[in-house]
Amino acid sequence: TRNVMVCRMSTEPEWVESQIAFVNEEWREQSELPRIYNRESRHANTTRHDVVIHNARLDEDQYNLDGCGYTLINHQTAVTDFHNKEVIADQYFPEMKSVILDLTGAHAAFSFPFYQVRSKNPANFFDAYSLYMHCDFSPDTWLQFAQHIVKESGSSEEYPEESWDFALYNFWRPIENPVEKDPLVLIDARTVERKDIINYRLIEEGDKAQAAVPLFNKNQRYCYFPCMKLDEVLVFKQLDSRTEKSLVCPHTSFIDPNAAPDAAERQSIDIRFMCVFPKQT
């Protein structure tokens, strides 16, 4: 019998201690952007910090998309093969679109044309689980990308920014087996300061491929959901143009000290939706 983590104890422990890599503080005041595009550049531009990561399952009455920026839902999918692109497009995207509309009350939701299935042994650096705290999009350029998603969807409606607000969400789900190691950790969006978010590039040269990373701040609160099961989906916010809502929920994977030595490798699927809301007047 394998010595796997006992998932019935998902409400324990209350917290774990681990290390999370953050972009180096030296980049805070630089006009040039850091570049992280492979293992070597990640090591050169990040520093590990000792942190306490709280068990979010104990705070079920506290988490929501507009406050802390994340929520955990139960969802039984009809999809049995997450490696089949046609099945993902024809079945999983429509399933999740229905969920995000119900969760947010958005006027409309548009799926991103790409998604990621992550594993420990990926085809390239960006298909691996991330090992540094990051945001998937830049707060400075994401609204242009949101409009691009609407246009590419073939929508007959237009959503000018003076009349509509936008929010980006991730759906993160384990596949093949429950999460026994390398779970996802999130920063509670209520503890993220805008001044701590800086842009970076995901390529070695040029001025394309821009995203964002948070700098370490001792006031940040870190949370995770231990032992995520196959019928659980972690929904979290990427960005939001509504000023009264939380802005962003940075995230990464981390080494769980409670994982068994022979724990199964984590596999997960990550898809994204852009939602539109009429501006409140």
Regions found by a protein language model. Name each.
Residues V6, W15-A212, N219-Q220:
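Non-heme Fe(II) oxygenase catalytic core, chiefly the N-lobe of the double-stranded beta-helix
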Residues A211-T281:
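Catalytic core of Fe(II)/2-oxoglutarate
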Residues T1-R2:
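N-terminal mitochondrial targeting presequence
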